[in-house]
């Protein structure tokens, strides 16, 4: 009877060891399956047309006296207003800012520099672009106009993002399936998504920035979305 005790104890320990080993092996299989993943980059691009424009311009007069500079600036301001009105710019689209004044000279004042700035904001993108193209007529008429290039923006970008992200994700899934099918495996479910920044560029541009690009120089633009999607592999 006493001889059977060590035997029973040994069999019990063996059974426990087998059970523990099975658990470890089982976890190992599950971990391996959990780690069988593939991360694929997908992208989507859409051509859009800007729906808003901002155009900044200014004129500066410099004269020995403030009064002379003010008179000259007033004449040029009237010419600019008249030009913009004739070109079809609406009163609600035009902002005329107050005059800014600087003195010329260090210590002794040698003159005064007065500047008037204007800003046009409008959803009539093509019309304002045409006005900007014709603004050289002011220079030809003796008005020393200083004008920035119009800035063209797209105000509906937030509503476009979901559509592009969905398309980019489908693109990643297609790419992943092609890669995995070539190995005889099966593309599994979604494990994770990393959304990149949106790039808004001029048409067919290859410009890419880590923090995103927002080009305002062209009316037509390309919006590109990029996602990195991780799928399981079976």
Segments predicted by a language model, with ranges:
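Short, charge-dense linear interaction motifs
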Residues: 1-234
